[in-house]
Amino acid sequence: MREKIVLAYSGGLDTSIIIPWLKENYSCDVIAMVGDVGQGDDIDAVVAKAHKTGASKVIVKDLREEFLTQYVYPAISTGAVYEHKYLLGTSLARPPIAKAQVEVALAEGATAVSHGCTGKGNDQVRFEHAFQALAPELKIIAPWREWTLKSREDCLDYAEAHGISVAQSREKIHSRDRNLLHVSHEGGELEDPNNAPLDTTWTWTKSPQEAPDRVEEVTIGFEGGVPVSINGMKLEPLALIELLNEIGARNAIGRIDLVENRFVGIKSRGCYETPGGSLLLAAHRELEALCLDRDTLHYKQEVALKWAELVYFGLWFTPLRESLDAFVASTQKNIAGAVKLALYKGNIAVAGRTSPKSLYRPDIASFTMGAGYDQKDAEGFIRILGLPARSRALIENAGKEKVSK
Protein backbone atom coordinates (compact mmCIF):
# COMPACT_ATOMS: atom_id res chain seq x y z
CA MET A 1 0.00 0.00 0.00
CA ARG A 2 1.41 3.39 -1.01
CA GLU A 3 2.27 5.88 1.69
CA LYS A 4 -0.06 8.88 2.01
CA ILE A 5 1.40 12.32 2.61
CA VAL A 6 -0.79 15.35 3.37
CA LEU A 7 0.60 18.59 1.95
CA ALA A 8 -0.49 22.06 3.08
CA TYR A 9 -1.27 23.32 -0.41
CA SER A 10 -1.74 26.91 -1.57
CA GLY A 11 -1.32 26.66 -5.32
CA GLY A 12 1.71 28.95 -5.20
CA LEU A 13 5.13 28.22 -6.67
CA ASP A 14 6.55 26.16 -3.81
CA THR A 15 3.63 23.84 -3.07
CA SER A 16 2.84 23.45 -6.77
CA ILE A 17 6.21 21.84 -7.45
CA ILE A 18 6.23 19.90 -4.18
CA ILE A 19 3.42 17.60 -5.33
CA PRO A 20 5.43 16.05 -8.21
CA TRP A 21 8.61 16.18 -6.14
CA LEU A 22 7.03 14.14 -3.33
CA LYS A 23 5.70 11.59 -5.81
CA GLU A 24 9.11 11.28 -7.47
CA ASN A 25 11.10 10.98 -4.26
CA TYR A 26 8.71 9.15 -1.93
CA SER A 27 6.61 7.06 -4.37
CA CYS A 28 3.56 8.20 -2.43
CA ASP A 29 0.03 9.45 -2.83
CA VAL A 30 -0.17 13.17 -2.13
CA ILE A 31 -3.30 14.56 -0.50
CA ALA A 32 -3.44 18.33 -0.96
CA MET A 33 -5.08 20.14 1.96
CA VAL A 34 -6.21 23.66 1.10
CA GLY A 35 -6.90 25.82 4.16
CA ASP A 36 -9.12 28.77 3.28
CA VAL A 37 -8.16 31.64 5.58
CA GLY A 38 -9.45 34.30 3.23
CA GLN A 39 -6.60 34.39 0.74
CA GLY A 40 -9.06 35.36 -1.97
CA ASP A 41 -8.01 32.70 -4.45
CA ASP A 42 -10.42 30.97 -6.78
CA ILE A 43 -10.64 27.82 -4.66
CA ASP A 44 -12.03 25.76 -7.54
CA ALA A 45 -9.03 26.76 -9.65
CA VAL A 46 -6.64 25.85 -6.83
CA VAL A 47 -8.29 22.44 -6.47
CA ALA A 48 -8.11 21.84 -10.22
CA LYS A 49 -4.45 22.82 -10.26
CA ALA A 50 -3.63 20.42 -7.42
CA HIS A 51 -5.27 17.56 -9.29
CA LYS A 52 -3.52 18.51 -12.52
CA THR A 53 -0.17 18.64 -10.73
CA GLY A 54 -0.64 15.11 -9.44
CA ALA A 55 -2.54 15.18 -6.15
CA SER A 56 -4.51 11.99 -5.60
CA LYS A 57 -7.04 13.88 -3.49
CA VAL A 58 -7.76 17.50 -2.61
CA ILE A 59 -9.51 18.50 0.61
CA VAL A 60 -10.63 22.09 1.21
CA LYS A 61 -11.13 23.34 4.76
CA ASP A 62 -12.99 26.62 5.30
CA LEU A 63 -11.05 28.07 8.23
CA ARG A 64 -12.10 31.70 7.90
CA GLU A 65 -14.44 31.91 10.89
CA GLU A 66 -12.08 29.92 13.10
CA PHE A 67 -9.12 32.02 11.99
CA LEU A 68 -10.91 35.23 12.92
CA THR A 69 -12.56 34.26 16.19
CA GLN A 70 -9.91 31.98 17.67
CA TYR A 71 -6.72 33.60 16.40
CA VAL A 72 -7.14 37.15 15.05
CA TYR A 73 -9.57 38.42 17.68
CA PRO A 74 -7.45 37.12 20.59
CA ALA A 75 -4.45 38.88 19.04
CA ILE A 76 -6.39 42.16 18.90
CA SER A 77 -7.64 41.70 22.48
CA THR A 78 -4.07 41.04 23.60
CA GLY A 79 -2.73 44.04 21.70
CA ALA A 80 -0.10 41.82 20.12
CA VAL A 81 2.40 43.48 17.78
CA TYR A 82 5.82 42.05 16.95
CA GLU A 83 8.74 44.48 16.98
CA HIS A 84 6.54 47.60 17.10
CA LYS A 85 4.91 47.11 13.68
CA TYR A 86 3.95 43.59 12.61
CA LEU A 87 0.37 42.54 13.40
CA LEU A 88 1.25 38.84 12.97
CA GLY A 89 -0.90 38.18 9.91
CA THR A 90 1.03 35.16 8.66
CA SER A 91 2.02 33.97 12.15
CA LEU A 92 -1.63 33.73 13.21
CA ALA A 93 -2.73 31.89 10.06
CA ARG A 94 -0.29 29.01 10.37
CA PRO A 95 -1.68 27.31 13.53
CA PRO A 96 -5.23 26.78 12.18
CA ILE A 97 -3.86 25.53 8.85
CA ALA A 98 -1.46 23.12 10.57
CA LYS A 99 -4.23 21.95 12.91
CA ALA A 100 -6.55 21.24 9.97
CA GLN A 101 -3.72 19.48 8.15
CA VAL A 102 -3.15 17.15 11.10
CA GLU A 103 -6.88 16.42 11.31
CA VAL A 104 -6.93 15.49 7.62
CA ALA A 105 -3.82 13.33 7.98
CA LEU A 106 -5.32 11.36 10.86
CA ALA A 107 -8.69 10.99 9.12
CA GLU A 108 -7.09 9.81 5.86
CA GLY A 109 -4.66 7.39 7.48
CA ALA A 110 -1.62 9.32 6.28
CA THR A 111 1.80 8.64 7.74
CA ALA A 112 3.36 12.03 7.03
CA VAL A 113 2.68 15.73 6.61
CA SER A 114 4.56 18.17 4.41
CA HIS A 115 4.85 21.92 3.88
CA GLY A 116 6.46 24.36 1.46
CA CYS A 117 8.35 26.49 3.96
CA THR A 118 12.00 27.33 3.37
CA GLY A 119 14.78 26.36 5.76
CA LYS A 120 15.51 30.00 6.50
CA GLY A 121 12.09 31.18 7.61
CA ASN A 122 9.75 31.16 10.59
CA ASP A 123 6.95 29.17 8.95
CA GLN A 124 8.85 25.89 9.13
CA VAL A 125 8.89 26.27 12.92
CA ARG A 126 5.23 27.27 13.05
CA PHE A 127 4.08 24.24 11.07
CA GLU A 128 6.40 21.67 12.57
CA HIS A 129 5.94 22.74 16.18
CA ALA A 130 2.19 22.41 15.63
CA PHE A 131 2.62 18.96 14.06
CA GLN A 132 4.69 17.78 17.03
CA ALA A 133 2.26 19.22 19.56
CA LEU A 134 -0.83 17.74 17.91
CA ALA A 135 0.33 14.47 16.35
CA PRO A 136 3.93 13.56 17.21
CA GLU A 137 3.54 10.20 15.49
CA LEU A 138 3.35 11.81 12.05
CA LYS A 139 6.51 12.04 9.97
CA ILE A 140 7.41 15.55 8.79
CA ILE A 141 8.73 16.15 5.29
CA ALA A 142 10.23 19.57 4.50
CA PRO A 143 11.28 19.55 0.82
CA TRP A 144 13.19 22.83 1.03
CA ARG A 145 15.59 21.12 3.45
CA GLU A 146 15.98 18.08 1.20
CA TRP A 147 15.92 18.96 -2.46
CA THR A 148 18.72 20.40 -4.59
CA LEU A 149 16.77 23.51 -5.58
CA LYS A 150 18.53 26.55 -4.13
CA SER A 151 16.40 29.51 -5.18
CA ARG A 152 13.02 30.58 -6.45
CA GLU A 153 14.58 30.77 -9.90
CA ASP A 154 15.45 27.07 -9.58
CA CYS A 155 11.84 26.43 -8.59
CA LEU A 156 10.65 28.23 -11.71
CA ASP A 157 12.92 26.03 -13.82
CA TYR A 158 11.52 22.91 -12.12
CA ALA A 159 7.95 24.09 -12.71
CA GLU A 160 8.67 24.78 -16.37
CA ALA A 161 10.31 21.37 -16.83
CA HIS A 162 7.25 19.66 -15.34
CA GLY A 163 4.70 21.75 -17.23
CA ILE A 164 3.38 23.46 -14.10
CA SER A 165 1.83 26.90 -14.56
CA VAL A 166 2.65 29.43 -11.82
CA ALA A 167 1.90 33.11 -11.33
CA GLN A 168 5.51 34.00 -10.50
CA SER A 169 8.16 34.81 -13.08
CA ARG A 170 11.73 36.05 -13.00
CA GLU A 171 10.32 39.56 -13.31
CA LYS A 172 7.62 38.95 -10.67
CA ILE A 173 9.54 37.05 -8.05
CA HIS A 174 7.87 38.39 -4.88
CA SER A 175 6.73 35.85 -2.32
CA ARG A 176 3.26 36.80 -1.12
CA ASP A 177 0.93 35.49 1.54
CA ARG A 178 -2.64 36.72 1.88
CA ASN A 179 -5.44 36.09 4.34
CA LEU A 180 -8.31 37.98 5.95
CA LEU A 181 -5.91 39.96 8.12
CA HIS A 182 -3.10 40.95 5.78
CA VAL A 183 -0.98 40.57 2.67
CA SER A 184 2.77 40.07 3.04
CA HIS A 185 5.38 40.82 0.40
CA GLU A 186 8.96 39.53 0.46
CA GLY A 187 11.78 39.01 -2.02
CA GLY A 188 12.69 40.86 -5.18
CA GLU A 189 13.77 44.47 -4.68
CA LEU A 190 12.72 44.22 -1.01
CA GLU A 191 15.78 42.10 -0.18
CA ASP A 192 17.80 45.33 -0.19
CA PRO A 193 16.53 47.28 2.84
CA ASN A 194 17.64 50.51 1.17
CA ASN A 195 15.19 50.03 -1.69
CA ALA A 196 11.80 51.64 -1.37
CA PRO A 197 8.91 49.29 -2.23
CA LEU A 198 7.77 49.68 -5.81
CA ASP A 199 4.27 50.93 -6.46
CA THR A 200 3.54 47.48 -7.87
CA THR A 201 4.64 45.81 -4.62
CA TRP A 202 1.46 46.89 -2.85
CA THR A 203 -1.57 44.93 -4.04
CA TRP A 204 -4.35 45.75 -1.56
CA THR A 205 -4.23 49.27 -0.15
CA LYS A 206 -4.30 52.55 -2.01
CA SER A 207 -1.29 54.80 -1.72
CA PRO A 208 -1.75 57.99 0.32
CA GLN A 209 -1.64 59.92 -2.95
CA GLU A 210 -4.49 57.85 -4.38
CA ALA A 211 -6.59 57.90 -1.20
CA PRO A 212 -9.57 60.29 -0.96
CA ASP A 213 -8.93 63.97 -0.25
CA ARG A 214 -11.42 63.91 2.60
CA VAL A 215 -11.63 62.41 6.07
CA GLU A 216 -13.69 59.25 6.48
CA GLU A 217 -14.99 58.40 9.94
CA VAL A 218 -15.73 54.88 11.12
CA THR A 219 -17.07 53.80 14.53
CA ILE A 220 -16.18 50.34 15.81
CA GLY A 221 -18.21 48.80 18.64
CA PHE A 222 -16.86 46.21 21.08
CA GLU A 223 -18.34 43.81 23.62
CA GLY A 224 -16.04 41.89 25.94
CA GLY A 225 -13.04 43.12 23.97
CA VAL A 226 -14.41 41.64 20.73
CA PRO A 227 -15.49 43.81 17.78
CA VAL A 228 -19.19 43.44 17.06
CA SER A 229 -20.34 46.44 15.04
CA ILE A 230 -19.36 49.09 12.52
CA ASN A 231 -21.13 52.44 12.52
CA GLY A 232 -23.77 50.98 14.84
CA MET A 233 -24.52 48.01 12.59
CA LYS A 234 -24.05 44.57 14.18
CA LEU A 235 -22.03 42.27 11.94
CA GLU A 236 -20.79 38.69 11.99
CA PRO A 237 -16.98 38.34 12.21
CA LEU A 238 -16.40 37.65 8.51
CA ALA A 239 -18.57 40.52 7.31
CA LEU A 240 -17.05 42.85 9.89
CA ILE A 241 -13.41 42.28 8.91
CA GLU A 242 -14.23 42.41 5.20
CA LEU A 243 -15.93 45.80 5.61
CA LEU A 244 -13.08 47.17 7.73
CA ASN A 245 -10.56 45.92 5.17
CA GLU A 246 -12.47 47.74 2.46
CA ILE A 247 -12.65 50.97 4.47
CA GLY A 248 -9.01 50.80 5.53
CA ALA A 249 -7.67 49.88 2.10
CA ARG A 250 -9.31 52.78 0.30
CA ASN A 251 -7.87 55.18 2.90
CA ALA A 252 -4.29 53.84 2.61
CA ILE A 253 -4.40 52.37 6.12
CA GLY A 254 -2.10 49.59 7.28
CA ARG A 255 1.03 49.72 5.11
CA ILE A 256 4.08 48.49 7.03
CA ASP A 257 7.73 48.24 5.92
CA LEU A 258 9.71 46.25 8.46
CA VAL A 259 13.17 44.78 9.00
CA GLU A 260 12.43 42.01 11.47
CA ASN A 261 14.29 39.41 13.49
CA ARG A 262 13.27 35.91 12.50
CA PHE A 263 13.21 33.16 15.10
CA VAL A 264 16.04 31.34 13.29
CA GLY A 265 18.35 34.32 13.84
CA ILE A 266 18.17 35.93 10.41
CA LYS A 267 17.11 39.50 9.79
CA SER A 268 14.61 39.81 6.96
CA ARG A 269 12.70 42.63 5.33
CA GLY A 270 9.01 42.44 4.56
CA CYS A 271 6.21 44.76 3.55
CA TYR A 272 2.75 44.16 4.96
CA GLU A 273 -0.74 45.51 4.30
CA THR A 274 -3.13 45.18 7.24
CA PRO A 275 -5.99 47.64 6.66
CA GLY A 276 -8.82 46.27 8.81
CA GLY A 277 -6.55 44.88 11.50
CA SER A 278 -4.87 48.26 11.96
CA LEU A 279 -8.27 49.86 12.55
CA LEU A 280 -9.29 47.18 15.04
CA LEU A 281 -6.04 47.50 16.98
CA ALA A 282 -6.23 51.29 17.16
CA ALA A 283 -9.85 51.25 18.34
CA HIS A 284 -9.29 48.49 20.89
CA ARG A 285 -6.33 50.30 22.41
CA GLU A 286 -8.39 53.44 22.91
CA LEU A 287 -11.19 51.51 24.58
CA GLU A 288 -8.75 49.81 26.94
CA ALA A 289 -7.36 53.22 27.88
CA LEU A 290 -10.87 54.12 29.06
CA CYS A 291 -11.77 50.88 30.78
CA LEU A 292 -8.64 49.35 32.35
CA ASP A 293 -6.99 50.51 35.55
CA ARG A 294 -3.39 51.67 35.27
CA ASP A 295 -1.65 48.62 36.74
CA THR A 296 -3.63 46.12 34.67
CA LEU A 297 -3.11 48.14 31.49
CA HIS A 298 0.63 48.44 32.00
CA TYR A 299 1.11 44.80 32.90
CA LYS A 300 -1.03 43.74 29.96
CA GLN A 301 1.32 45.65 27.66
CA GLU A 302 4.16 43.44 28.91
CA VAL A 303 2.03 40.34 28.31
CA ALA A 304 1.30 41.54 24.77
CA LEU A 305 5.01 41.63 23.96
CA LYS A 306 5.53 38.06 25.15
CA TRP A 307 2.36 36.81 23.45
CA ALA A 308 3.42 38.35 20.14
CA GLU A 309 6.85 36.78 20.44
CA LEU A 310 5.41 33.34 21.18
CA VAL A 311 3.08 33.48 18.19
CA TYR A 312 5.73 34.88 15.86
CA PHE A 313 8.12 32.12 16.92
CA GLY A 314 5.50 29.47 16.16
CA LEU A 315 4.77 28.49 19.76
CA TRP A 316 0.99 28.71 19.60
CA PHE A 317 0.31 25.25 20.99
CA THR A 318 2.02 25.82 24.33
CA PRO A 319 0.85 26.04 27.95
CA LEU A 320 2.33 29.53 28.27
CA ARG A 321 0.27 30.94 25.39
CA GLU A 322 -2.86 29.37 26.87
CA SER A 323 -2.05 30.82 30.29
CA LEU A 324 -1.49 34.28 28.86
CA ASP A 325 -4.81 33.96 27.03
CA ALA A 326 -6.52 33.29 30.35
CA PHE A 327 -5.05 36.48 31.81
CA VAL A 328 -6.04 38.55 28.79
CA ALA A 329 -9.57 37.12 28.83
CA SER A 330 -9.98 38.27 32.44
CA THR A 331 -9.00 41.82 31.44
CA GLN A 332 -11.54 42.00 28.63
CA LYS A 333 -14.74 41.58 30.64
CA ASN A 334 -15.30 45.33 30.88
CA ILE A 335 -13.95 46.30 27.45
CA ALA A 336 -17.23 47.46 25.95
CA GLY A 337 -18.18 50.56 24.03
CA ALA A 338 -17.41 52.32 20.77
CA VAL A 339 -14.48 54.20 19.29
CA LYS A 340 -14.75 56.64 16.39
CA LEU A 341 -11.72 56.82 14.10
CA ALA A 342 -11.00 59.52 11.53
CA LEU A 343 -9.07 58.18 8.52
CA TYR A 344 -7.10 60.33 6.11
CA LYS A 345 -4.43 59.25 3.63
CA GLY A 346 -2.88 56.51 5.76
CA ASN A 347 -3.39 58.22 9.11
CA ILE A 348 -5.67 57.13 11.94
CA ALA A 349 -6.88 59.75 14.42
CA VAL A 350 -9.24 59.15 17.32
CA ALA A 351 -12.40 61.22 16.94
CA GLY A 352 -14.23 59.96 20.03
CA ARG A 353 -14.63 57.09 22.45
CA THR A 354 -17.40 56.05 24.83
CA SER A 355 -17.99 53.14 27.18
CA PRO A 356 -20.55 52.16 29.83
CA LYS A 357 -17.60 50.65 31.71
CA SER A 358 -15.38 53.72 31.48
CA LEU A 359 -13.16 54.50 34.49
CA TYR A 360 -12.73 58.05 33.26
CA ARG A 361 -14.63 60.59 35.39
CA PRO A 362 -14.75 64.12 34.00
CA ASP A 363 -15.63 65.55 37.41
CA ILE A 364 -12.39 64.18 38.88
CA ALA A 365 -10.20 64.78 35.82
CA SER A 366 -11.20 68.45 35.47
CA PHE A 367 -9.25 71.31 37.03
CA THR A 368 -12.31 72.23 39.08
CA MET A 369 -11.97 71.84 42.84
CA GLY A 370 -14.05 69.27 44.71
CA ALA A 371 -15.61 66.21 43.13
CA GLY A 372 -14.29 63.93 45.85
CA TYR A 373 -10.64 64.80 45.28
CA ASP A 374 -8.89 67.05 47.79
CA GLN A 375 -5.75 68.46 46.17
CA LYS A 376 -4.17 68.88 49.62
CA ASP A 377 -4.01 65.09 49.87
CA ALA A 378 -1.34 65.14 47.17
CA GLU A 379 1.22 66.64 49.56
CA GLY A 380 1.37 63.61 51.85
CA PHE A 381 1.31 61.23 48.89
CA ILE A 382 4.27 62.99 47.25
CA ARG A 383 6.28 63.14 50.51
CA ILE A 384 5.87 59.39 51.04
CA LEU A 385 6.69 58.75 47.39
CA GLY A 386 9.81 60.90 47.68
CA LEU A 387 11.06 59.36 50.94
CA PRO A 388 13.69 57.11 49.27
CA ALA A 389 14.97 60.04 47.21
CA ARG A 390 15.22 62.30 50.28
CA SER A 391 16.97 59.59 52.29
CA ARG A 392 19.51 58.98 49.52
CA ALA A 393 20.16 62.69 49.12
CA LEU A 394 20.74 63.15 52.87
CA ILE A 395 23.22 60.26 52.96
CA GLU A 396 25.08 61.47 49.86
CA ASN A 397 25.24 65.03 51.15
CA ALA A 398 26.55 63.83 54.52
CA GLY A 399 29.29 61.92 52.73
CA LYS A 400 30.29 65.00 50.74
CA GLU A 401 30.56 67.06 53.95
CA LYS A 402 32.95 64.50 55.50
CA VAL A 403 35.15 64.55 52.40
CA SER A 404 35.27 68.35 52.34
CA LYS A 405 36.43 68.40 55.97
Curated annotation (Swiss-Prot):
Q: In which pathway does it act?
A: Amino-acid biosynthesis; L-arginine biosynthesis; L-arginine from L-ornithine and carbamoyl phosphate: step 2/3
Any idea where this protein resides? Cytoplasm
User: PROSITE patterns from the xrefs?
Assistant: ARGININOSUCCIN_SYN_1, ARGININOSUCCIN_SYN_2
Question: What is the annotated signal peptide range for this record?
Answer: none
Give residues annotated as binding L-aspartate.
Answer: 118, 122-123
Question: Looking at the UniProt record for this protein, which Gene Ontology cellular component terms does it annotate, in alphabetical order?
Answer: cytoplasm
Q: Per the record, what are the reactions this protein catalyses? A: L-citrulline + L-aspartate + ATP = 2-(N(omega)-L-arginino)succinate + AMP + diphosphate + H(+)
Its EC top class is: ligase
What GO terms are given for molecular function?
A: argininosuccinate synthase activity; ATP binding
Pfam families given for it?
Arginosuc_syn_C (PF20979), Arginosuc_synth (PF00764)
- Which residues does L-citrulline bind? 86, 91, 122, 126, 175, 184, 260, 272
Q: Which family does it belong to?
A: Belongs to the argininosuccinate synthase family. Type 1 subfamily.
Describe its assembly. Answer: Homotetramer.
This chain belongs to which protein, by name? Argininosuccinate synthase
- Chain's gene name: argG
